[in-house]
């Protein structure tokens, strides 16, 4: 779908921009779609640019069915090294790695829209091949599951046992349940917290 153009009158005439560039000008970055290498590179590049130019808060909008653990961790590792606080907000869906990214936002500023779907992840892989390949892949999945459980325990304040039980199978949460679980801090339609908040 083609982005609509937005016209702004200036002293020089008219300037044209897209909704995406308007969000970026407001220090807002969107992860929209599966988390993969392209998503990670785009998100990190935008976050880096905003962090270099100011230490003011950045909002990260998340609408993603999840995806690669490695690419999601690249985004999280970069977020954690920024001087700008990262406010996260789920719109639509934040599943699997997207839910982990959502949870890794600035404490007190992690939110979800009232009808967002949030999935606490269980790492998966389509394992095939010889027995030794399957064994190596299984060990890798177990390591990733332990790493994600430790990270979620850290950012939610839940015990490792509670996180491991929740990630033993995919766990779908409403925004209110995600708030109780510690993945988010607020349920609100507006990521600037200007509307109704609970």
Language model regions located:
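N-terminal organellar transit peptides
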Residues: 1-97, 103-198
């Amino acid at each position: 779908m083609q982005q609509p153009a937005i016209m702004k009158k200036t002293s020089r005439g008219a300037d044209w921009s897209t909704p995406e560039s308007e969000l970026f000008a407001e220090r807002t970055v969107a992860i929209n779609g599966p988390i993969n290498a392209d998503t990670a590179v785009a998100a990190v590049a935008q976050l880096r640019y905003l962090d270099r130019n100011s230490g003011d808060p950045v909002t990260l909008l998340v609408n993603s069915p999840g995806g690669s653990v490695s690419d999601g961790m690249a985004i999280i590792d970069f977020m954690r090294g920024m001087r700008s606080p990262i406010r996260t907000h789920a719109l639509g869906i934040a599943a699997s790695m997207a839910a982990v990214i959502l949870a890794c936002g600035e404490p007190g500023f992690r939110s979800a829209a009232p009808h967002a779907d949030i999935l606490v992840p269980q790492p998966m892989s389509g394992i095939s091949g010889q027995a030794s390949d399957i064994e190596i892949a299984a060990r890798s999945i177990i390591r990733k599951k332990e790493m994600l459980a430790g990270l979620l325990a850290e950012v939610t304040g839940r015990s490792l046992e509670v996180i491991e039980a929740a990630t033993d199978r995919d766990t779908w949460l409403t925004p209110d349940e995600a708030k109780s679980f510690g993945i988010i801090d607020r349920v609100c339609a507006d990521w600037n917290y200007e509307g109704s908040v609970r």
